[in-house]
């Protein structure tokens, strides 16, 4: 079991209020991602759940037990940090087994758990190597293996892919997702990368200044952002946000339209503009178009659409894809 409940959780460092008041339910077996900009409180929230930071007020429940004052070792959670934190003088096998040896577990049970974790993570052939002989991705798998052998109620990941290059990050995203599908254990994952959040999560928690802006599935947040912050944060490239007379036509203070929901033409359309920068990615091209009275608009089109700097184009937003926001920033 790995159900985690937070009720009116607050965190203060002296006079600084990092998390004002927060309520959240994480169901057993869910893959939940905390995402937000730097300083939004996502890592602090994870550390509160882990017990590495004390709660200033409120309650944390793990599987129906009040864990607010419970020491980290008693919570039944396993954490994987951004840095691998492996012992360089120990073999992979000894690194994975370390928490079990510290718990004075029977040698036969340690062997069983280490062997099982190594199979899951494709580390069986590397058990006798030391961390210095491994790639970055393999080292991160060893760190995950050290968490798996504890057979926790939930896994806590604190930006575990930040130290890896782009190709390894893609591979590890897939491996962690497959691991979740295999173990069916609750996972809470912290990242500032909304691509990781969108591709891995069952449920995303968008945080801003210690407050939850929105909770939902990746597609729910993408299709129905609750406010301007979520609209501008979720999606890459980010949503185009337009104020002024064009927004007023739609009865809103601000309207939003995603780059792929703007139709592009060389002949006619709602808005005439001039192509500034073109980003050619092969399958897609992102055009940054200057339209009078608006911010520069980003348009996503096919990779074969040939336009150049200075070309005149016409843009038409798809009417059913326009998002409307009021003066308070909330979706209408």
Curated annotation (Swiss-Prot):
This protein's record includes keyword Nucleotide-binding: yes
Keyword line: ATP-binding, Nucleotide-binding, Transport
One GO CC term on file: ATP-binding cassette (ABC) transporter complex, substrate-binding subunit-containing
MF terms in GO: ABC-type maltose transporter activity; ATP binding; ATP hydrolysis activity
Organism superkingdom: Bacteria
Pfam families named among the record's database cross-references: ABC_tran (PF00005), TOBE_2 (PF08402)
PROSITE patterns: ABC_TRANSPORTER_1, ABC_TRANSPORTER_2
Alphabetized InterPro entries for the sequence: AAA+_ATPase (IPR003593), ABC_transporter-like_ATP-bd (IPR003439), ABC_transporter-like_CS (IPR017871), ABC_transpr_MalK-like (IPR015855), ABC_transpr_MalK/UgpC-like (IPR047641), Mo/tungstate-bd_C_term_dom (IPR008995), NA-bd_OB-fold (IPR012340), P-loop_NTPase (IPR027417)
Annotated transmembrane regions: none
The ABC transporter domain, residue ranges: 4-234
Residues holding ATP: 36-43
Gene3D superfamilies noted in UniProt: 2.40.50.100, Nucleic acid-binding proteins, P-loop containing nucleotide triphosphate hydrolases
The keyword Cell division is assigned to this record: no
Family as reported in the entry's similarity comment: Belongs to the ABC transporter superfamily.
Name of the protein: ATP-binding transport protein SmoK
